[in-house]
From Swiss-Prot:
Pfam families in the record: 7tm_4
PROSITE patterns attached to this UniProt entry: G_PROTEIN_RECEP_F1_2 (PS50262)
Glycosylated sites: N13, N18, N106
Similarity field: Belongs to the G-protein coupled receptor 1 family.
Disulfide cysteine pairs (residue numbers): C112-C194
Functional note: Odorant receptor.
Gene Ontology CC entries for this record: plasma membrane
Extracellular side: 1-44, 94-112, 180-216, 281-287
SUPFAM superfamilies: Family A G protein-coupled receptor-like
Gene3D superfamilies per record: Rhodopsin 7-helix transmembrane proteins
Protein name: Olfactory receptor 11H2
Amino acid sequence: MCPLTLHVTGLMNVSEPNSSFAFVNEFILQGFSCEWTIQIFLFSLFTTIYALTITGNGAIAFVLWCDRRLHTPMYMFLGNFSFLEIWYVSSTVPKMLVNFLSEKKNISFAGCFLQFYFFFSLGTSECLLLTVMAFDQYLAICRPLLYPNIMTGHLYAKLVILCWVCGFLWFLIPIVLISQKPFCGPNIIDHVVCDPGPLFALDCVSAPRIQLFCYTLSSLVIFGNFLFIIGSYTLVLKAVLGMPSSTGRHKAFSTCGSHLAVVSLCYSPLMVMYVSPGLGHSTGMQKIETLFYAMVTPLFNPLIYSLQNKEIKAALRKVLGSSNII
């Protein structure tokens, strides 16, 4: 293992009458402290995962945009979700990859909070979009006759815009408040990304109210959306079990099963990480949990949807021009 070195660089001196303060103007993202050969291995592994994630989600978004037969609300929601995943994984992974090859592993003060903002905003938009997709499934299966009149193109556009706008506004105030707190050193963030837990630990002045505000918002967005999704699929399951046709039941189970698998992948690590102030979590476990929902989940989402959905597989074959590829 690499020895932990206390970095004292990145401090900005601010002089006042009778006093002198040093404030942080950059942070050190410590990441994984390990030998250089292991750093190279992790860089290669995460680069491959990142490339596969971009390719998989990009392929789904592209084929759903190209195939007009799939221009329905259900598939358009999925296309937006894949597009969102590309930006979500790109908010943290490129900097993470650069740090694997860097000795200093620094990130500017503004860069850290921008990463924090986009990572949380895109994650919130993802949670909201999964909730909207559950609502769409509920309408399609439980209210099939009313579905075309309710889920119109106009409503679809409104819901997608609402997910993006609310996602980018949800954590804006707490992130601004945290950024205004004094950080006077040390400036080491013992994490792979700029995360509120390690940032609160570096704050010179304790801010329990801001902490409570931040974790309350996290709990609301995670549990609120999760409970809505579970409630929707409870009603969907009840409706599916009452279907007289076995073919209809199989198709409904296939579609809903894919969505529930993605929901489980997204929400399980989030619930562990952000519904409490992080008590009882070792820094190593926090890093692994973050990597799981920041990299592994976006990687498997396109696989789950494409392998379970015949329409998407057919569209992929059509666009790629070869049935042997998939």
